[in-house]
């Protein structure tokens, strides 16, 4: 979900509540806040936590709070705060700018997961973070850390996504994090999308997923083409 600001650059919580309710009414099954689209790196802690509280209060669908930063201790703190506010889960982005090793990424993700009992969605977006989370590490976290339960995949490599899905433990869910790859990734077994276009195409996405699940791949392609025209 985008983060609304007013003309003076201040966080607009009334607009955030209204937008969250509208997105729910449009058919979104959950909301991810303070992610990439929500401009998380520009938010102060007070703004981020106020946003969490406002959106959680405004809707009845699950709210996934973006608590990952490039600072492990800071990410742990935000995760604990999100849990106290009632978030349904947290989004843990690969630490950006620092370009950590795979061992460093592992330590960061384990620390975030240990900070609360909330489900953790790992967020792999190398074009912005500067570091790809390896498929081997994604699978290791999925197998060894009980509350690492999902992946938002914005890595742009459908072949690697297919490897993760094929080898992940039962119950581990993979979501598209790239609007342009959502339909192709359905063929590999993703369960949904954490999108940008879903701000205005949620009914279309619901229709596309329904057609795909029903075996109507041609129909799903037609709806995807409609989504592309709107994006």
Task: Mark where each language-model region is.
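Short acidic/histidine-rich active-site segments
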Residues: 176-178, 191-197
């Amino acid at each position: 979900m985008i983060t609304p600001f007013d003309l003076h650059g201040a966080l607009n919580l009334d607009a955030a509540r209204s937008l969250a309710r509208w997105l729910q009414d449009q058919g979104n099954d959950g909301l991810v806040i303070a992610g990439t689209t929500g401009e998380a790196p520009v938010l102060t802690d007070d703004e981020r936590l106020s946003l969490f509280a406002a959106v959680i209060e405004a809707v009845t669908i699950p709210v996934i709070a973006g608590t990952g930063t490039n600072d492990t201790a800071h990410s742990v703190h935000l995760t604990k705060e999100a849990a106290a506010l009632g978030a349904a889960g947290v989004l843990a982005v690969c630490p950006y700018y620092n370009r950590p090793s795979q061992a460093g990424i592992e330590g960061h993700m384990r620390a975030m997961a240990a900070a609360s009992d909330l489900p953790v969605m790992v967020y792999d977006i190398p074009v912005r973070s500067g570091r790809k989370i390896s498929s081997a590490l994604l699978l290791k976290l999925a197998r060894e850390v009980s509350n690492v339960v999902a992946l938002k995949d914005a890595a742009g490599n459908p072949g690697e996504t297919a490897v993760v899905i094929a080898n992940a433990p039962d119950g581990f869910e993979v979501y598209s994090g790239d609007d342009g790859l959502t339909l192709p990734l359905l063929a590999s077994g993703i369960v949904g999308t954490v999108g940008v276009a879903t701000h205005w195409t949620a009914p279309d996405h619901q229709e596309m997923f329904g057609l795909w699940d029903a075996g109507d791949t041609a129909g799903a392609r037609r709806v995807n083409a409609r989504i592309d025209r709107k994006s």
